[in-house]
Amino acid sequence: MTRKATGSILLVLLSLYFLTCAAQKPAEKFTIRSGVNVSHWLSQSEKRGEERLAYITAADFAKIAAIGFDHVRIPVDEVQLWDSTGTREEEAFNLLHMAVNAALANKLRVIVDLHIIRSHYFNAKSNTLWTDPREQEKLADMWRQLSAEMRRYSVSMVAYELLNEAVADNPEDWNSLVAMLIRQIRADEPERTIVIGSNRWQAANTFPDLRVPENDAHIILSYHFYTPFALTHHQAWWTDFSEYGGPVNYPGQVVDTLLYRDLSPTAAATMRNWANGYFDKARLEREMAPAIQYAREKKLPLYCGEFGVYPTIDNEIRLRYYQDLTDIFRANNVAYCHWCYKGDFPILDEKGEPDSRLVAILTAK
């Protein structure tokens, strides 16, 4: 064999080697830092037709990126994506694809969050998802369809959240469902990032009860944080203490306990039992500690997928709370997603423009 022939063979072998290495290069990870929920559109909304088409458009994702966020969480409901017979609602699926493509065009990562299904709503008194195997199979089928729709998108850019704020009476019911859904998705999408919350509204203090698959690096743990409720949900109409319209403070005692005398027995009991108290930055961090510790033990990234303050309290107090909260997130390497973009806890003012002081806090490096 001539030197020329030997050199040619070596060149071919080297080319094959480098091509193989390139093919085996791991996909870019799904990495996020600060985002916003695009809520009350494909979830928790009666909007349909032209009203739904106009509520969120591609321009909104350009605005979100320009503000400085790096991802969006898009809640979707079963009633929007499928009718009562299980038939797909094509317009809603088309809107979901529009949203994902618009987000990607603006370099925003996306979490598709299955928020409410007919058998499970986080504020319902009872949910048949935990008692009826047929409803669990329906949920599995929803994820078969969503996975088939979404797998066209890069695993580095789109992630799935299995279910928002599971509220099983027994945490093992949620753990079993998580294991089943992950096995199913992994059969077709071994590297897709899956977001998993703890049982009971994704509360930080329920993380010790959560079980996640071992040796699965493509998982993000998620908790929600609205503590203290007397501050974050001041005068929110759906709470049982909405009648309280008095002052709110932070840091310090959120609501003066002497003011309980002016409340109904139900509202006073809620304030006394869990919604009120003395809160400062140190207390907030202690409240988050179980989730932070669990994520460290599991060596998995942690994400606060929802937090926010109803815009009815003094704005300086509101911003002070946001500043402490985001400082804690960043100090503990917790990614976070504000609830929400438009809607009840908005980052936009009445003219549709970003609240400059709020978004500066939310997007600070």
Where are these regions (language model features)?
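An active-site-proximal structural segment forming one wall of the substrate-binding cleft
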Residues: 54-55, 61-70, 88-116, 124-159, ...
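Bacterial Sec-dependent N-terminal signal peptides
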Residues: 1-26
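Surface-exposed, active-site-proximal loop segments in enzymatic domains
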Residues: 44-51, 78-94, 118-135, 347-353
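Active-site region of glycoside hydrolase catalytic domains
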Residues: 133-278, 285, 289-310, 331-334
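Aromatic-rich peripheral "rim/lid" segments of glycoside hydrolase catalytic domains that contact
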Residues: 313-365
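Short, solvent-exposed turn/loop segments enriched in Gly/Ser/Thr/Pro and often Arg
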Residues: 75-77, 114-118, 198-200, 337-345
